[in-house]
Amino acid sequence: VYPNGLGNPSGWDNGIGTANPHTADDVGFLTALMDKVSRNHKIDQRRIFFCGFSAGAIMSYRMGASLGDRIAAIGIASGTVGFTLPNGQVATIPQPVRPLPVIAFHGKKDTHIYYNGGGLRANDLSVADSIRFWLNADNCDSTPQVTTLQNGNVTRDGYHKCKQGADVVLYSFANGTHEFPSLQNNDNFSATDAMWEFFVRHPMP
């Protein structure tokens, strides 16, 4: 199911983004969408997953945190869990309702949501900050199992000692930009396949 964020500017009410929370309730919208699809189709309720790119990635982070009692795992491409406000306060997605498996992908040359934080539109939290957010939520050992692929161009950090088997996995792309990793772009890596393999191993406990 492929919902799309609308508005001007287009986006999602992800709790940290551009949508107006007084006119948009996208957590409610996506919850209603799950309900409708479940009524109209035979859905395995233990295998409902969310994934997204950029603003959709941030919305998937938000849904995983808020609806973890219904969502089994999330997949993230070029997202962040929050940003630093001008007054120095940090705005993030809500604290997750349960330990949640997360797989994330991010290019180190992303010029929209910077890998190391900052960025064009706001002082986004870094990829390391976002992963740390989930390591804390999932009560994971902070030492990853590191694997390099494609002659060192892709690095996989796997955190597998987590509460309730809620693994956290990060793929970093040395030459990756603000894009969904695929076999058709510079990453030469299928995030779709990696995400699905992760989802298959992580149904709702």
Where are the regions that the model predicts?
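Serine-hydrolase catalytic machinery in alpha/beta-hydrolase-like enzymes
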Residues: 1-49, 53, 58-62, 66, ...
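Structural recognition of the beta-strand scaffold that forms the well-ordered cores
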Residues: 1-4, 47-52, 58-61, 72-78, ...
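Short catalytic/ligand-binding loop motif for oxyanion handling, primarily in non-cytosolic enzymes
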Residues: 9-11, 83, 111-114, 179-181
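Alpha-helical elements of Rossmann-like donor-binding domains used by nucleotide-donor carbohydrate transfer enzymes
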Residues: 29-32, 129, 133, 190, ...
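Structured segments of extracytoplasmic/periplasmic soluble domains
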Residues: 33-40, 51, 63-70, 77, ...
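Extracellular/periplasmic catalytic domains that process cell-envelope and extracellular macromolecules
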Residues: 42-44, 51, 56, 66-69, ...
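The feature captures the conserved acid-bearing segment of alpha/beta-hydrolase catalytic domains
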Residues: 72-73, 78-154, 159-164
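Alpha/beta-hydrolase-fold serine-hydrolase catalytic core, especially in secreted/extracellular enzymes
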Residues: 100, 135-205
